[in-house]
């Protein structure tokens, strides 16, 4: 696994994920199916690198799906965009186990900061959008929070958004 502090991607073949940390758990399988479909459609249209912020919720689910699809999708890669070292230190044990497994198997891990700071999530979201040509979102329309910021930033930059909500 490559570990770098900053990198630039071939934006033309990269997609990023954004989504809410919390969602209706009874909808988990429906969300998983929609994410899988969006990832496969992006892959069929030339997207091979998928960037996840590895936050609890949609980010980890999307990363798990990418990892599960890699054996049947040659050239598909998973990039972890980690806002700061120690991001998962406060995760619940089950989420931490998923996070650690995905970190170990990610094709590239980018840690944007060694330390926690106030705007770390927004900086991570901006990094992902600026390095992607597609945003796959699970966005419910609320006009606040990181998912809103990322969705809005992609729209301002003219980056296509596939909203699976």
Give the positions of each predicted feature.
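Acidic/glycine-enriched connector segments
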Residues: 2-165
């Amino acid at each position: 696994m490559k570990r770098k502090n900053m990198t630039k991607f071939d934006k033309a073949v990269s997609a990023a994920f954004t989504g809410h940390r919390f969602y209706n758990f009874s909808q988990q399988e429906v969300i998983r199916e929609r994410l899988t479909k969006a990832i496969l459609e992006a892959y069929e249209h030339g997207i091979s690198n998928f960037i996840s912020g590895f936050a609890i919720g949609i980010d980890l689910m999307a990363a798990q799906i990418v990892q599960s699809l890699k054996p049947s999708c040659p050239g598909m890669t998973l990039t972890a965009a980690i806002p700061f070292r120690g991001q998962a230190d406060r995760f619940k044990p089950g989420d931490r186990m998923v996070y650690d497994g995905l970190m170990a198997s990610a094709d590239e891990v980018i840690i944007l900061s060694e330390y926690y700071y106030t705007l770390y999530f927004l900086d991570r979201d901006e990094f992902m959008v600026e390095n992607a040509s597609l945003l796959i979102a699970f966005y419910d329309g609320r006009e606040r929070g990181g998912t809103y910021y990322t969705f809005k930033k992609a729209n301002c930059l003219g980056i296509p958004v596939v909203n699976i909500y």
